[in-house]
Amino acid sequence: MIIQKFNRRHLAIYSIISLIGMNSCVGYKLGNNKPTHLQKVNSVSVPIFKNETLEPRLQTLVTNATIKAIQQSGTYQVSKQRNSDATLTATIRTISRRQLRSTRQNVLKTKEIEISIEVIFALQDNITGKILDKGTVKGNNTSYLDSNFQLTKRQAMQLAADDLATKISARVSEGF
């Protein structure tokens, strides 16, 4: 008799705990989480981005980083334009450098720099020509300057391009 009450009490407690545990996973979805307006898109082509800045070879850096980010997300297959469902076109609008820290002896000498790259993109359906998604994305990176300024600047631009590419990939594959 005492054992039955004890077991019933434990059963009730375990039932309540399991119900609470199951409710916490109600919004979780396994598998692909594409936005609803992009459900029919399975492959994307990414032509080289247009570069409106004066920074040479920036378009190849950002385009390659974007292709890599889309491939890593696994949502879309990257293919040639004639074989893809949509095309991701983009224009690099601005690249800005901002001093975050200076040396103690000379405020004009930069110690830490922030590089920002701004891109306007559009995802267009290859069959209908309809714009499926568009927007502006900004990628940032902060970096300490080394004695080799050119190398440090190039590495910081690569990291800013990677951040930008991750944001573009998240926007077209997850909707935010």
PLM region spans:
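Generic marker of residues within folded, mature protein domains
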Residues: 5, 15, 36, 80, ...
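A generic short-segment signal for beta-strand/edge and adjacent turn/coil regions
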Residues: 12-15, 47, 55-62, 84-92, ...
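Short linear motifs in low-complexity, proline-biased tails and propeptides
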Residues: 17, 162-166
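A structural "domain/chain start" motif
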Residues: 2-3, 22-75, 80-83, 127, ...
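Short hydrophobic alpha-helix segments
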Residues: 135-137
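Sec-dependent bacterial lipoprotein signal peptides
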Residues: 1-25
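Soluble non-cytosolic domains of exported or imported proteins
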Residues: 52-64, 110, 114, 150-163
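Surface-exposed short loop/turn segments
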Residues: 32, 73-77, 82-131, 140-151, ...
